Amino acid sequence: MLSNTLIIACLLVIGTTIALIAVQKASSKTGIKQKSYQPSIIIAGPQNSGKTSLLTLLTTDSVRPTVVSQEPLSAADYDGSGVTLVDFPGHVKLRYKLSDYLKTRAKFVKGLIFMVDSTVDPKKLTTTAEFLVDILSITESSCENGIDILIACNKSELFTARPPSKIKDALESEIQKVIERRKKSLNEVERKINEEDYAENTLDVLQSTDGFKFANLEASVVAFEGSINKRKISQWREWIDEKL
């Protein structure tokens, strides 16, 4: 009897241990699948457009000289909203950091502020347009309604600044050229069929029969002028408040 009782007790211990291990593994897998992120608003754009200055002004109500950063800067729980502001570096070689972020967290992004320098010659917007195409290719294909974008036209106080409508039109025209060049490149370069189809499909998402237009995107895209140095960012603040 004693030996039988001992055997049964051992079997119960072994069975319980196996069950606990199974539960832990299941919990671990579930945790990974259900991983969530804090909602965020992204600040992006070319170098020297005022991204970090905007983050500083929004979070400290002060204007300070900026330092070039190679890593994203963030401010959690902006204005007590539970939303994190994330400023991404604008250097061409570091733009992949934003792409990686969007590919994993697009559904948690409540809006994207794309900073531009209002004084830049429209003829020199090629790299800016390429950056926007990279962003839109992800946001428009990853989210049912895209991610709303504010084109924040900084340095509007300067004499050479152009109005937001002109900047928006120039970007539309340049983005269309970027899309055409990339499609042509895809047709000329031999690639794996699945990779080529994916790249072409993401570009098709951005085009309609009349070419590229911000108005035809799933997301809303607006352009407002402002000046960080003059602390005139009321329109930008209103847009942010709507997203919180």
Swiss-Prot record:
Q: Which domain of life is it from?
A: Eukaryota
Q: Where in the cell is it found?
A: Endoplasmic reticulum membrane
Q: Which GO terms describe its molecular function?
A: GTP binding; identical protein binding; signal recognition particle binding
A Pfam family: SRPRB
Organism from which the protein derives:
Saccharomyces cerevisiae (strain ATCC 204508 / S288c) (Baker's yeast)
Q: What does this protein do?
A: Component of the signal recognition particle (SRP) complex receptor (SR). Ensures, in conjunction with the SRP complex, the correct targeting of the nascent secretory proteins to the endoplasmic reticulum membrane system. May mediate the membrane association of SR.
Family per UniProt?
A: Belongs to the SRP receptor beta subunit family.
Subunit record text: Heterodimer of an alpha and a beta chain.
- What is the protein's name according to its record? Signal recognition particle receptor subunit beta
* Listed InterPro entries: P-loop_NTPase, SRP_receptor_beta_su
Q: Where are the transmembrane segments?
A: 7-23
Q: What is the lineage of its organism?
A: Eukaryota, Fungi, Dikarya, Ascomycota, Saccharomycotina
What does the entry list under GO cellular component? endoplasmic reticulum membrane; membrane; signal recognition particle receptor complex
Classify the protein's membrane topology as the record does. Answer: Single-pass membrane protein
Binding of GTP: at which residues?
Answer: 45-53, 66-69, 90, 154-157
Q: What else is known?
A: Present with 8250 molecules/cell in log phase SD medium.
**Which Gene3D superfamilies does this UniProt record tie to the protein?**
P-loop containing nucleotide triphosphate hydrolases
Could you tell me the Gene Ontology terms of the biological process aspect for this record? Answer: protein targeting to ER; SRP-dependent cotranslational protein targeting to membrane, signal sequence recognition
Which key words are in the record? Answer: Endoplasmic reticulum, GTP-binding, Membrane, Nucleotide-binding, Receptor, Transmembrane, Transmembrane helix
